[in-house]
């Protein structure tokens, strides 16, 4: 992959006026390959699928922003922030996939080698023919152009020095997007016979254009009133208008045998629009948000409690094929919140928060229509969908002893959703496709907890760091077996408990640093309806790192770690990877200039793998990546932006904000940049 970027920033300020802005250009050219396997849970025997894909993605992006802050007097503050962006992408992709009625790994070691149609059309040469349901080979070309702009104006006026103030915030945004997609696909159905008794074949050559336009504006007024000592009552009202329009048109190019992805659109293609595969949708949203909150500020604690009321009026004009409708919807959402901070000392605090949020299903999900633009994933609307409500609670505690250089941090999070929207899927065993209908379901929740401990030993040269975490997910979904009147829908529950631990020990002096580290992550995955799907995969790693500082301002750093996976059904996932990185840097010109040479994954062993588990199935994907590479840096520090405040304005106040817990406390894992 190739990446090229350039940035231009400026910042200046006077006593009353601050100006800043930036312009950025970015170009990316990436070649992405992936192989994957998916297991869909079914009451009467699971469905299995494998896929290979290759993509070439090119993207050009330009963004410019400006910031002006004016303080005409000590009581008034005015901020204006406009932004503009332009983007262009070109993507070429090719994919091969296949669906099977039993586990293909029971017959061959690598089913992904048996997905190309040219290789498997001869039954005598196909070891998976007895379990094969479909095979799909496709290619697509996408080009997209987008232009967007937005601006925010904020005026704040202090009415006295007791905390009474009023704030106005206005915003406008506009986006125009033009997307064109060209596709070729060939699907063979091995369980569905044609009129001649052979395998059914579906060939689709299409050109799809989808221009979209969006704009919005909003105005918000906030008033804060001190009602007692260090006690404030705040009122806020916001009105927002949003407009969205999309017009999808699909042209059938099957009647043009000379057309391909590498050729121009044929003459006369405009006469072959398929009305049933097109869609026009125009949304108009009129949103109101009125909130009230009460805030107490005391020496030892801060408490904020409030409620937001959100009446919404929506209008939809919709057309798909012969189906046309103009419909409106009026809903009422509400969102309570609570935030408590208890300060035990300057370096020790406990924070507890609660957030509640109600949300509505999309208007298109409520329409009683059938969307068969993708024959492998047919979608049906559900007018009976109810709104969902999500509860989220967080607890956070941290403390630090500067004398002993000892820190403790803990965090607990719990989230649950009532009437969450789940996809009820009906499987077609003849085609390997799905018919999906959104439905409300209860039982989705998750809990997460972590504990971190960092301390120096008495001589301060040795440090120990421990990070422990636990995550539990309870996912529910509807699984359907049978067809028509014989269809039976059942509720499935999958649970995933993941326990992790990372331990680091380090020695440091003025010129030398050496550390040892180890980590383990263990998962217990259970499926209620089909216990045979249960797995207990785990990963572990161990390694060392060192850094040597030379008297002539040269630094040598290196780290090495052995990372391992175990417990996966696919034996190719159970592997060891020895990862070695190194860096050499030299500082000169009185510390203002640094040149460094970095080498990542020197042994070329690292892989990129992602996994997901839901109540309806699990999937594993492996991606190619430029993990083994070198980088040469030259950094020269200039102080031409004046004060630190001016530099912060130039950077848009970006950053992590606040002190960190300490080096090396995060959990270990696979993939991602490996810092020195």
Describe each PLM feature range:
Residues 1, 6-676:
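Primarily recognizes Gram-negative and organellar outer-membrane beta-barrels
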């Amino acid at each position: 992959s190739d990446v090229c970027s350039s940035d231009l920033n400026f910042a200046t300020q006077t006593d009353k006026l601050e100006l800043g802005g930036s312009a950025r250009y970015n170009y990316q050219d990436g070649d992405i390959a992936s192989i994957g396997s998916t297991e869909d849970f079914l009451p009467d025997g699971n469905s299995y699928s494998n896929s290979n894909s290759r993509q070439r993605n090119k993207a050009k992006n330009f963004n410019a922003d400006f910031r002006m802050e004016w303080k005409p007097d000590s009581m008034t503050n005015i901020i204006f922030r406009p932004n503009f962006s332009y983007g262009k992408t070109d993507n070429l992709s090719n994919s091969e996939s296949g669906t099977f009625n039993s586990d293909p790994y029971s017959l061959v070691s690598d089913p992904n080698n048996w997905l190309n149609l040219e290789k498997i059309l001869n039954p005598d040469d196909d070891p998976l023919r007895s379990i094969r349901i479909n095979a799909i080979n496709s290619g697509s070309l996408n080009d997209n152009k987008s232009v967007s702009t937005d601006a925010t104006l904020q005026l704040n006026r202090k009415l006295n020095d007791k905390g009474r103030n009023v704030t106005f915030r206005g915003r406008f945004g506009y986006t125009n997007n033009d997307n064109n997609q060209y596709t070729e696909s060939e699907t063979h159905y091995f369980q569905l016979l044609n009129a001649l008794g052979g395998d059914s074949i579906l060939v689709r050559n299409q050109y799809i254009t989808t221009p979209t336009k969006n704009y919005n504006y909003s105005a918000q007024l906030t008033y804060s009133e001190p009602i007692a000592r260090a006690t404030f009552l705040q009122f806020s009202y916001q009105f927002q208008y949003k407009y969205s329009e999309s017009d999808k048109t699909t042209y059938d190019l099957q009647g043009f045998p000379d057309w391909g992805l590498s050729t121009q659109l044929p003459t006369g293609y405009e006469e072959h629009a398929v009305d049933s595969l097109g869609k026009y949708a125009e949304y108009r949203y009129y949103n109101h948000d009125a909130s009230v909150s009460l805030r107490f500020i005391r020496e030892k604690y801060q408490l904020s409690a409030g409620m937001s009321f959100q009446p919404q009026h929506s209008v939809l004009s919709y057309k798909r094929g012969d189906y046309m409708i103009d419909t409106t919807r009026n809903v009422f959402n509400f969102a309570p919140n609570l935030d408590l901070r208890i300060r035990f000392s300057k370096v020790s605090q406990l924070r507890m928060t609660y957030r509640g949020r109600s949300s509505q299903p999309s208007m298109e999900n409520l329409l009683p229509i059938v969307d068969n633009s993708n024959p492998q994933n047919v979608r049906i609307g559900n007018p009976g969908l109810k709104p969902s409500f999500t509860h989220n609670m967080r607890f956070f505690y941290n403390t630090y002893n500067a004398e002993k250089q000892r820190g403790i941090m803990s965090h607990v999070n719990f989230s649950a959703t009532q009437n969450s929207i789940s996809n009820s899927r009906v499987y077609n065993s003849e085609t390997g496709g799905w018919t999906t209908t959104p439905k409300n379901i209860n039982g989705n929740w998750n809990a997460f907890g972590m504990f971190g401990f960092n301390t120096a030993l008495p001589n301060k040269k040795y440090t120990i760091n421990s990070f422990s975490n636990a995550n539990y997910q309870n996912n529910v979904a509807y699984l359907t077996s049978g067809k028509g009147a014989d269809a039976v829908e059942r509720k499935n529950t999958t649970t995933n408990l993941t326990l992790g631990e990372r331990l680091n020990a380090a020695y440091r002096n003025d010129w030398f640093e050496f550390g040892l580290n180890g980590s383990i992550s263990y998962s217990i995955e259970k499926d209620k309806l089909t216990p045979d799907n249960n797995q207990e995969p785990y990963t572990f790693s161990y390694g060392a790192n060192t850094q040597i500082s030379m008297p002539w301002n040269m630094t040598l750093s290196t780290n090495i770690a052995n990372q391992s996976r175990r417990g996966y059904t696919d034996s190719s996932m159970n592997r060891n990877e020895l990862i070695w990185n190194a860096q050499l840097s030299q500082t000169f010109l009185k510390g203002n200039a640094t040149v460094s040479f970095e080498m990542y994954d020197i042994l070329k062993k690292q892989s990129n793998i992602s996994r997901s588990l839901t109540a309806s199935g699990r999937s594993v994907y492996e991606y190619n990546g430029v993990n083994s590479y070198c980088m040469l840096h030259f950094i020269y520090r200039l102080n031409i932006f004046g004060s630190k405040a001016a530099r912060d304005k130039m950077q848009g106040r970006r950053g992590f904000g606040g002190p960190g817990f300490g080096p090396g406390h995060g959990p270990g894992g696979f993939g991602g940049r490996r810092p020195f």
